[in-house]
Amino acid sequence: MEASAILRGARVSPQKARLVAAQVRGLSADSAVNLLRFSSKKAACLIKKVVESAIANAENNHGSNIDDLRINTIIVDEGRMLKRFMARAKGRSSRIVKRSSHITVVVGPAK
C-alpha cells in the first residue's frame, strides 16, 4: 500500500527543491533519509521531513516496514509567490518574487 505526505507553502524555490528531489527519486526510504541528512541544501531538510512523515504514515496506517519501502513519486510544484519591491537608483523600484513550493512524497513497497 502506498502512503503519502504533503508539505504546502515551503519557503524554498521550486527550482532548487527539484534538484534535491531528483537525487532521492526511486531510492529506498532509509537510503533517501540518509542521503538527505548529510546534504547541505536547505531544501534537503524540508524534503527529509516530508519523506519521514510519509514513512510514518505507511508504518502507522498500513503496518509497513521501513526496509520494504521506496520513494515511488516525489513532486515539487510551485506554491504562492510573495511579491516584494526593492528600491533602485533614481527613484525607481524593482519587483522581487519570493517563491514557495508544494512538496508531495509517495512511498510504497519496493517492487
Curated annotation (Swiss-Prot):
A UniProt-annotated Pfam family: Ribosomal_L22
Q: Where is the signal peptide?
A: none
Which keywords, in A-to-Z order, does the entry hold? Answer: Ribonucleoprotein, Ribosomal protein, RNA-binding, rRNA-binding
Molecular function, one GO term: structural constituent of ribosome
Which biological process terms from the Gene Ontology are attached to this UniProt entry?
translation
> Entry's PROSITE patterns?
RIBOSOMAL_L22
This protein's GO cellular component annotations are: cytosolic large ribosomal subunit
Q: Which domain of life is it from?
A: Bacteria
Q: Which InterPro entries does its entry note?
A: Ribosomal_uL22, Ribosomal_uL22_bac/chlpt-type, Ribosomal_uL22_bac/org-type, Ribosomal_uL22_CS, Ribosomal_uL22_sf
Task: Name the job this protein performs.
Answer: This protein binds specifically to 23S rRNA; its binding is stimulated by other ribosomal proteins, e.g. L4, L17, and L20. It is important during the early stages of 50S assembly. It makes multiple contacts with different domains of the 23S rRNA in the assembled 50S subunit and ribosome. The globular domain of the protein is located near the polypeptide exit tunnel on the outside of the subunit, while an extended beta-hairpin is found that lines the wall of the exit tunnel in the center of the 70S ribosome.
Assembly information from the UniProt record: Part of the 50S ribosomal subunit.
Record's family?
A: Belongs to the universal ribosomal protein uL22 family.
The name of this protein is Large ribosomal subunit protein uL22
Q: Which organism is it from?
A: Xylella fastidiosa (strain Temecula1 / ATCC 700964)
